[in-house]
C-alpha cells in the first residue's frame, strides 16, 4: 500500500481559466474504461496540431522539454468544469501529475480526483498569481507539497491549504471508495442480515 504523505516535483504553469473536461481529454478518446493509457490524450487539441498526433504544437507549454517530467500543475479558477467524465482525471494521473494547484475546481472533477488519488490544492487567487510569477521567473522550479502538514513550500515560502478530513484520511491511507467499503464489509453484511430477518418476519406477520 502506497500512502501519499507529500510530493516534490517540477511545476508546469497553465495560466488559463475555466479549462473544461473536453479540453483535458476530448470525447473521441472516451471509449475505453481501463484507466491506463489516457495520458497520451491529455490536452490533445492543445498538444497536437493534427488529429493523428504526428505534429506537436511546439508553442504549448507541456511540449517544452523542461516540463517533460512535470508532476505538479499550476492553473487558474474553475479547472475541470464541463461534463463529469472521469477520464479527465485518468488522463492527468496517467500522464504523471500528482498535484494540481488552483483557486477553484469543478465539484464533480474535485471528487473524481480524490477517488483516483490526485491531490487538488485550493489557494486564494492572489496566492495563485504570486506563484505564477515565481514559476514564470524560475522555469523548471520544484514545489514541495506536504499532505501531512497541508503546506506548499516554494523558495522557503510556505503556503497553507485546507483539506476536509475525509479526503485527507483517504489519501494518507491509500483508500478509494471500494477500499472504504471493504473495510466495513462485516458491518454491511451484519446490517443486511438484520434487515433480511426483519423483512421475513414482517412478511410472515402480514401473511
UniProtKB/Swiss-Prot annotation:
It holds the Pfam family Aconitase_C. It catalyses: (2R,3S)-3-isopropylmalate = (2S)-2-isopropylmalate. Its EC number is 4.2.1.33. The keyword Lyase applies. The keyword Transmembrane does not apply. Keywords: Amino-acid biosynthesis, Branched-chain amino acid biosynthesis, Leucine biosynthesis, Lyase, Plasmid. Signal peptide: none annotated. InterPro entries: 3-IsopropMal_deHydase_ssu, Aconitase/3IPM_dehydase_swvl, AconitaseA/IPMdHydase_ssu_swvl, IPMI_Swivel, LeuD. Pathway: Amino-acid biosynthesis; L-leucine biosynthesis; L-leucine from 3-methyl-2-oxobutanoate: step 2/4. GO terms for molecular function: 3-isopropylmalate dehydratase activity. GO terms for biological process: L-leucine biosynthetic process. GO terms for cellular component: 3-isopropylmalate dehydratase complex. Transmembrane segments: none annotated. Heterodimer of LeuC and LeuD. NCBIfam families: leuD (TIGR00171), PRK01641.1 (NF002458). Belongs to the LeuD family. LeuD type 1 subfamily. This is 3-isopropylmalate dehydratase small subunit. The lineage of its organism: Bacteria, Pseudomonadati, Pseudomonadota, Gammaproteobacteria, Enterobacterales.
